[in-house]
Amino acid sequence: MPTSIKAIKESLEAVTSLLDPLFQELATDTRSGVQKALKSRQKVIQAELAEEERLEAMLSYEKALYKKGYKAIAGIDEVGRGPLAGPVVAACVILPKYCKIKGLNDSKKIPKAKHETIYQAVKEKALAIGIGIIDNQLIDEVNIYEATKLAMLEAIKQLEGQLTQPDYLLIDAMTLDIAISQQSILKGDANSLSIAAASIVAKVTRDQMMANYDRIFPGYDFAKNAGYGTKEHLQGLKAYGITPIHRKSFEPVKSMCCDSTNP
């Protein structure tokens, strides 16, 4: 067994099990540096085990479908139902069988600083990705619920021509009128890795669009609020009025439209 603290730290880096004999051997070493390194490595392993357990639980729907013979399971989710401006964006993602991506979760639970990293990991591992975008004008015409369905259907359509085609759909709290076997899962983005993958793809795609709109329409803080009705956004509306990407069927934009048409 190594004796210097530096050598012990290097040995601990290779340990992946809490039952490794090295932990028991080092438990009697009274040096504070050794005990600190020991506890630090145990904490890392515990976190990795917890993450593995979480990811395994989020594969429960997929594993049940694999047992039934399905091979290409697509997760579908959307982002952007609630904002006052911008499109609703849906994504359809097919991951390889039993694929696990560390940190993948409901996009709302992923720290913003990690969005891009996990998004890139999904893009690298996914067998197929489709994205559907429905703009604010169509949202106003058909309502946000129907627009969400259209975005999801468009995301599925975008898979046409790709090597892998879905034989089953796992959808976040929605049922689609399409001839593919499917299951609607409440809070699916937190309970299915396939849906979570779609969630982060849709989220990053929409955030990039809103950051671009922020450059086109400064003063509304779109890059930070993604079109949601924050204090800065509402101040922008009051100061500069409605932009071409605002949803005129959403309040307070709707009332502002009415006010502008009344003398």
Swiss-Prot record:
Cofactor note: Manganese or magnesium. Binds 1 divalent metal ion per monomer in the absence of substrate. May bind a second metal ion after substrate binding.
BP GO annotations: DNA replication, removal of RNA primer; mismatch repair
Cofactor(s) it depends on: Mn(2+); Mg(2+)
Compartments in which it is found: Cytoplasm
Binding site for a divalent metal cation: D77, E78, D172
Known catalytic reactions: Endonucleolytic cleavage to 5'-phosphomonoester
Molecular-function GO terms, alphabetical: manganese ion binding; RNA binding; RNA-DNA hybrid ribonuclease activity
GO cellular component: cytoplasm; ribonuclease H2 complex
EC number(s) stated in the UniProt entry for this protein: 3.1.26.4
Boundaries of every RNase H type-2 domain copy: 71-262
UniProt keyword list: Cytoplasm, Endonuclease, Hydrolase, Manganese, Metal-binding, Nuclease
HAMAP family to which the protein is assigned, alphabetical: RNase_HII_B (MF_00052_B)
Function: Endonuclease that specifically degrades the RNA of RNA-DNA hybrids.
PANTHER family listed in its UniProt record: RIBONUCLEASE H2 SUBUNIT A, RIBONUCLEASE HII
Family statement: Belongs to the RNase HII family.
Record's protein name: Ribonuclease HII
Organism in which the protein naturally occurs: Streptococcus pyogenes serotype M1
